[in-house]
Amino acid sequence: MASTTPITMEDLQKALEAQSRALRAELAAGASQSRRPRPPRQRDSSTSGDDSGRDSGGPRRRRGNRGRGQLRDWSRAPPPPEERQESRSQTPAPKPSRAPPQQPQPPRMQTGRGGSAPRPELGPPTNPFQAAVARGLRPPLHDPDTEAPTEACVTSWLWSEGEGAVFYRVDLHFTNLGTPPLDEDGRWDPALMYNPCGPEPPAHVVRAYNQPAGDVRGVWGKGERTYAEQDFRVGGTRWHRLLRMPVRGLDGDSAPLPPHTTERIETRSARHPWRIRFGAPQAFLAGLLLAAVAVGTARAGLQPRADMAAPPTLPQPPRAHGQHYGHHHHQLPFLGHDGHHGGTLRVGQHHRNASDVLPGHWLQGGWGCYNLSDWHQGTHVCHTKHMDFWCVEHDRPPPATPTPFTTAANSTTAATPATAPAPCHAGLNDSCGGFLSGCGPMRLRHGADTRCGRLICGLSTTAQYPPTRFGCAMRWGLPPWELVVLTARPEDGWTCRGVPAHPGTRCPELVSPMGRATCSPASALWLATANALSLDHALAAFVLLVPWVLIFMVCRRACRRRGAAAALTAVVLQGYNPPAYGEEAFTYLCTAPGCATQTPVPVRLAGVRFESKIVDGGCFAPWDLEATGACICEIPTDVSCEGLGAWVPTAPCARIWNGTQRACTFWAVNAYSSGGYAQLASYFNPGGSYYKQYHPTACEVEPAFGHSDAACWGFPTDTVMSVFALASYVQHPHKTVRVKFHTETRTVWQLSVAGASCNVTTEHPFCNTPHGQLEVQVPPDPGDLVEYIMNYTGNQQSRWGLGSPNCHGPDWASPVCQRHSPDCSRLVGATPERPRLRLVDADDPLLRTAPGPGEVWVTPVIGSQARKCGLHIRAGPYGHATVEMPEWIHAHTTSDPWHPPGPLGLKFKTVRPVALPRALAPPRNVRVTGCYQCGTPALVEGLAPGGGNCHLTVNGEDVGAFPPGKFVTAALLNTPPPYQVSCGGESDRASARVIDPAAQSFTGVVYGTHTTAVSETRQTWAEWAAAHWWQLTLGAICALLLAGLLACCAKCLYYLRGAIAPR
C-alpha cells in the first residue's frame, strides 16, 4: 500500500524533473513512446472512460495529456512530421498492468512560515484552482504569502463578433514548463494554458477559450511580451483569441514558434525573430519629415514651364502729346501696379487710389473714363482693354491733314495720331475718324458736349507694364495643377482658351505666339525628360507622389491584419437604413409663408430665406425732378426767388434755382385786356426781350393769350394775371440709394413635415423623414442679385435687380456699373436735360393723359378768396431712361426676387412605386423675351398643359420641368427665332421678342474683352466618363484608400469600447 506521507510542492517538483530527465534520455536513445493499452471500445481518445489498469472502486481524473498515457517533454520542440507519422504507424508493445494506486491523502503545502497547509483534493474539482491542478498545471513557485511577480499573472483576451464589441478578459498563470504540448492531430491544446488567477469568465467564454485552433493569424511582439492571435468558430459564432505566450522555457532556450502559422513577419531581429524592429510611428514620422522637406523646397523647385521661343522685339508706341498739351503732361496718370486691380492714379502731384476715383468697370478691365479737367474743357483718362488713353477736347480748329499712327501687329495699343488732335467736327452724325484713339462716350460736366455724338478726339498713351510672370496653384497634390498669372503684359498675347489673360487668371494652359505655358505634372515630367531630367521637374514629380506614398504606408500599416472589408460592411452598410418607400403622392404647395397642404403627412412652408455673398457697392444720391411756382393776380416786377418770396417757398426755390439745367418761365394771362398793363401786350414778342429790359429776370417770358383769368375772381376783366414756374433736376438731401451685390445666391425653403423641420435647396431637394421621402420641385435660384436700399425721406425700402448688369451694353450708365462713394454724396449718370414747362388750362382735355418724359404741366387754380389763386403742378417721368432715377430703379428691379410665380411641387414616396405622369402636349401662349447668344438668360413664360409635369424644350434644348399651369423661367438661348416649344409631344411655335448681341452695342465704342456664354450642352455618361477618365481613376483610388482608412478607424472604435470596459 502506498505511503500516506504528505507530499509537498518540492517533492512534486523533484518528481516532475526526474520524469522529464527520464523522458529526455529515452527520446535520445531512439526509444519509441510507450502507450498504455486500452480496451477496443475505449480506443477513441475523445471518449471518457476508465483505464484498463485502474480500479473501479474510485474514479481518477486525468491530468492533461498524461491522463491518456502519453508522455512528452514540453520544454522541447515537437518531433518533425515524418517521425511523428512513423511513430503513429508502429504498434505499441503491450505492458503489464500496474496495480491501481491508492487514493492519495491531502498533501501538506509549504507556507514558508514553518507550518503546512492542506493540499487541494485531487478528486473532482470544486473551484477554478482545483480544475487547473486537475488539468496538470501548477501555480508558479513562489511563496503564497508574498506578492506574486509581474509575470506570474498575465492577461489574455477574447471577443466575439456575434456579441458585438464586448471584450472578455482572462487572467491566468503561466506554466513554466515551456511551450504547451500538441495533441495527436498537431493542434494546440489551449486547455493546458488555462490556469486562471482572476475572476472565472462565463461558461461560454471558457468553452471558447479551450476550443482547439491550430491557425495563427499573427504573432505580435510588444516589449518583452509575445501574443498569438487566432480566430475560430464555436457553434457557428466567430471568436477572436489573443493568447499570451511564454518568453523562455525551463531549460533556458527561447520558446519556438507554433508550427501552424499563416503569416510570418520577415523583419529580422537578433533577439526575437518574429518581432517588428520599427513600428508605425517611426515610419510615419519619417514620411512626414520627407514630405516637409519636399514641400519646403517646392516653391524653389516648382516653376511653371513655358515652352516658348525667344520673344520677338516689339516696337514701343510713341508717346507724343503734342505742343498744345504740354501743360497737361504733368497730369498724365501712371498706373502703379495693375490699374484694373486697384493701382494708384497720379493726378497732378497727388497719388490717389484708383478704386476711389475710377468707375467700377475700370477695375474689371472694361471701358470707362475719368474727368480730370475743370468746367471749361474736358480732359479725360479713358480705359479700355486694360489700356489707358489720354483724351483732350477743347475749342481749337482741326489741322488740315492728320497723320494717324498704327502700332505693330502684336501690340494691343490703339492707333495714335502723331500730331496734336483736333476737336471734333460739328454735327452729331460726324465722327472723329482717324483722330479717335479708343475714347468712348464721355460724360462731361458742361452742357456743350454735343459734338461728334459724344466722341472725344484724343491721344493714346501707355504705361510701362511689368513683365509677364506666372505661378503654380497647388491643390494638395491633386492634378491638374493650374497656372496663375501674377503679372501680364498685353503685348505678350497670352490667352486662356482664346480669352486674353489678366493678372489673377487661373488656367491649366496658356497660349501665346511665343509658345505655351503650363504647370501640369505630366507636362513637367515630359519636359524634364526632354531636358535630360532637370532637378526642378523631378522634384515636382516627387512632391506629387509623396502624399500618396504616405497614405499607402498608413493604410498598409493600419489594415494589414484587420478585415477592412468586413468592418466596412458591418459599420457603414449595416448602419445605414434606407427609408422604405410605398405609394407615391403628388401635390402642390403655395409659396407664401404659412401655406400648408396634405400629402400622406401634413407639410407646411415655414419660411423662405436666401444665402449669398455680399459685396458693398457704395451709395449714391439719385437725381430728383423738383418744380415750384406761383400764381399772382398782377405782373410782378422781379421774377425771381427773391421777388416772389411771398408766393414761392424759399427753400425749394433756392434749391431749384441753384440746380443744373433749370427751366424758368413767366406767363402773362389775358394781356390784351383794356387798362392796366394792357399796353405791355405789344411787347410780348417770342423772346420777351423788351420786357426783360424793364423787369430783369433769368426766366423766359411768354404770353398766354386765350387763358382765362377767372382765378382772380372779383376783379374787372381788364386785370392781368401772371403765372411763374421753376423746375430743375437737383440732388435731394433726403434721398439716397445704397447698392449691394449678392453673388452665389441660394434660396432655402424651410418646410415642416409632420412637425419635423427640413430645409431644401436646388442642390438638395429631398427630405428624409420617418414617414418616407419628400421630394420638392424647387425653382431655380435667382442667380446674382443687386440690392438697392432706397431711403426716400425716411421711408426705406429695398428693390432687387436680377442678374449681373451688362456694363458693356445698355446698362453702362446704371447704378451697378458705377463706383459710388460711402457717404452717398456722389451724383451718378449724365447731367439731365433741361425740363420743359407747359401752361395747361383747367378744362384742357390734355389733363386726362399723363405728362411726357421731362415735362412739367402748370395749371392755375381758382382761390377761395378774392385776389387769391394757386397752381397745380404735374411732373412727368424723367426724360432720360439711362440715368439713375427712382423710376429707372423701379422699372428695372423687383420687390421679391426669390418668390416664384407658381407653387412648389411635392412628391411624397410611401408603398407601390408608380410612375409620375408626363405631359405630352405642347404648352400654350409661350413668349420668349430677351437676348440670344449674349450670355444673359432670356425670359420664357407660358402655360404648361395638364396630365403631369411638362419637361419643356425650346428648339431641342431642355429648359426644365414645370407642373401644369403658368410657368416663368429663364434660359440661355443659342439660336435666333423662330422657337419651337414642346412638352414631350407635338411642338408649337412660341412668340419671340429677342435681340442679338450686336443690337446692344454702341457704334464707335471700343469694349473690353468678353466671352459669349452658351447654354449647357447635353452629353452621354460614356462621353462624360471619356472626358474625365483621369479624375474618375483618381477618384476611385481615393475612394478605395478612404474606405480602407474609414474601415480601420471604424473597426478600432468598434473594439475600443469593449477594450476599455471589458466584462
From Swiss-Prot:
- Outcome of substituting A919T: In strain: Isolate RVI/SAITAMA.JPN/94
Q: Name one GO cellular component term.
A: membrane
Q: What mutagenesis or variant effect is reported for Y325H?
A: In strain: Isolate RVI/ISR/79
Task: Write out the ranges of the annotated region (Functions as E2 signal peptide).
Answer: 279-300
Q: Which residues carry this modification: Phosphoserine?
A: S46
Q: Where does the record say carbohydrate is attached?
A: N353, N371, N410, N429, N658, N759, N791, T1011, T1012
Effect on the protein upon substituting A756V: In strain: Isolate RVI/CAL.USA/91, Isolate RVI/CAL.USA/97, Isolate RVI/ISR/75, Isolate RVI/ISR/79, Isolate RVI/ISR/88, Isolate RVI/MYS/01, Isolate RVI/PAN/99, Isolate RVI/SAITAMA.JPN/94, Isolate RVI/SHANDONG.CHN/02, Isolate RVI/SLV/02 and Isolate RVI/TOKOYO.JPN/90
Instruction: Explain the post-translational modification.
Output: Structural polyprotein: Specific enzymatic cleavages in vivo yield mature proteins. Two signal peptidase-mediated cleavages within the polyprotein produce the structural proteins capsid, E2, and E1. The E2 signal peptide remains attached to the C-terminus of the capsid protein after cleavage by the signal peptidase. Another signal peptide at E2 C-terminus directs E1 to the ER, with a similar mechanism. Capsid is phosphorylated on Ser-46 by host. This phosphorylation negatively regulates capsid protein RNA-binding activity. Dephosphorylated by human PP1A.
Compositional bias ranges of the Pro residues kind: 93-107
Example GO molecular function: metal ion binding
- Membrane-spanning segments: 535-555, 1029-1049
Q: What is this protein called?
A: Structural polyprotein
Question: What organism is this sequence from?
Answer: Rubella virus (strain TO-336) (RUBV)
